[in-house]
Amino acid sequence: MEEEILYKIILVGESGVGKSSILVRFTDNTFSQHFAPTLGVDFNVKTIRNKETGQTVKLQLWDTAGQERFKSITQTFYRGSHGVIVVYDVTDPKSFERCKNWVEDINQYTQDGMIIILVGNKSDMVAQRKVTFEQGQEMAEQLKTKFLEVSAKENNGVTQVFDLLVQDIEATMKNSKVAQNQLNLNSEVGQKRGCC
């Protein structure tokens, strides 16, 4: 029986950018035009198969409120998380600019090397678009994150966000295990060199 892998993933961003829509599209493959704003934090679980390793991975998905009054709740959920998806609305430049603040918070409340993906949602709203794909890429480079655009409504790119996140988390975990094993080997060698 294979070992169960569990990753905690958090979705953050301003209110109304479509975090809940992305989550529900990914977990239930449905879309609703009208969502009540998330109050505090919402939680969901989805089991997927890693496309590279074939291993089963359980994702614990936390959808956080975008309102300022819930910010302290959101910060507590960063702890113990493996990855964060920062969502903005491509029709709302203010939500895009606030991504810098979200990433600063993530960096402040998590350990170094947190996997972060910047996601521009509502890419289907071409006529209302105010933030270009290139601006999203540029912001991601500045913030040192990965970047994707999605449409939760049309189910474009949503699964790719989670696939990319899982691949990056696993690569980071593998590298840290290699580093940890190297550390353990070095300490064993150091112990064996001692006298008597």
Curated annotation (Swiss-Prot):
Compartmental location: Cell membrane
Lipidation (S-geranylgeranyl cysteine): 195-196
This protein's UniProt keywords: Cell membrane, GTP-binding, Lipoprotein, Membrane, Nucleotide-binding, Prenylation
Residues binding GTP: 13-20, 63-67, 121-124
Keyword Amino-acid biosynthesis: no
UniProt key word Lipoprotein: yes
A Pfam family recorded for this sequence: Ras
Membrane topology reported for the UniProt record: Lipid-anchor
Principal localisation: membrane
PROSITE patterns: RAB (PS51419)
A GO CC term assigned to this protein in UniProt: pathogen-containing vacuole
One Gene Ontology biological process: intracellular protein transport
Record-linked InterPro entries: P-loop_NTPase, Rab, Small_GTP-bd, Small_GTPase
GO molecular function list: GTP binding; GTPase activity
Motif (Effector region): 35-43
Family, similarity comment: Belongs to the small GTPase superfamily. Rab family.
NCBIfam families: small_GTP
This protein's name: Ras-related protein RabC
